[in-house]
Amino acid sequence: MTEPAYYNRSLDQGLKQFLSNANDMVSELKNDGYRISDSCRFSVFIKKLSNFIENGFEIGDRQFDIALLAEGSRDFAELRAIVKSKTVRQKNRKEIQKIFGGSGKPSDDTLTQSRDFQFELYLAAIFDLSGFYVSIIEPDFLFKYEEVTYSVAAKRINSEQKIHTRFSKAKKQIKKSGINGFIAFSLDRIVWDKMKKDPYIITNNLDTLYNAGQTILHDLLKTKVKKAAWANRDPLVVGHIASLTIPAILARSISFGFSSNQLFIPSFDISEKSKIYRHIKELPQKIKWPIKSQ
């Protein structure tokens, strides 16, 4: 595969401010008519975080599930983008309602639909909040750059064995739309499973977030992902967007960290002299989310 163009942004936020924002998001969604039960993973996270703060637990305390907190912080960081995006909110009411299912940790999910929808909506929200014109239609959404419209089929991949299957389905969706498009895919679950670690890191330096999982990510891109991309070549599939989101606990400041990574990769047959190739290389520079002030 062609060398990817990167977008990466890492942010952190104190636990009390994060909790306040999480409560505000849930209240806003409930007021808008969404059903969010006390047993929902987002509600459970709020209870766990409140308990953590009130009881003065420390990072590494064995009586507290830090992995659950870290995963919840990633869920809320992604939900924040979805809530902020008017385009996504207006067009995806049924899909947004479905993301409130699922378990606190992805490894405990028996069904993946909730987090699958979460990734699709989160990616669409990123483009919308970055100033792109976004339409929520098949395959998953469209965006426009320099008056050129691209389609996106977004797939969350839960195992290496499913990479080819998910790419094949995405290709069919793009072909059905008839619009040049990207196969976008989340490798969060695969990367962390291969690391054989909890889905977070503890650090005092936000810069280390960028390096977490990068070796495994690039190995996947050069092997299993490259093989699946080659097998699913099509004139309408002009590129791929690899996504990796990393939650962290910043021990010294007792805060949550969050690193959002998107890698834009031109397809094999795209000429380096073409407008499409230039667009793919420029797109990471146009992504503006997450923004700390929001």
Describe every region a protein language model picked out.
Residues 134, 157, 190:
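Short, solvent-exposed loop/turn segments at secondary-structure junctions
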Residues 7-8, 133, 146, 151, ...:
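Compositionally biased, intrinsically disordered low-complexity regions enriched in proline and serine
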Residues 1-112, 116-129, 164-294:
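Charged, structured surface patches that assemble and position nucleic-acid processing machinery
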Residues 127, 141-143, 147-160:
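Conserved catalytic cores of phosphodiester-cleaving nucleases, focusing on short active-site segments
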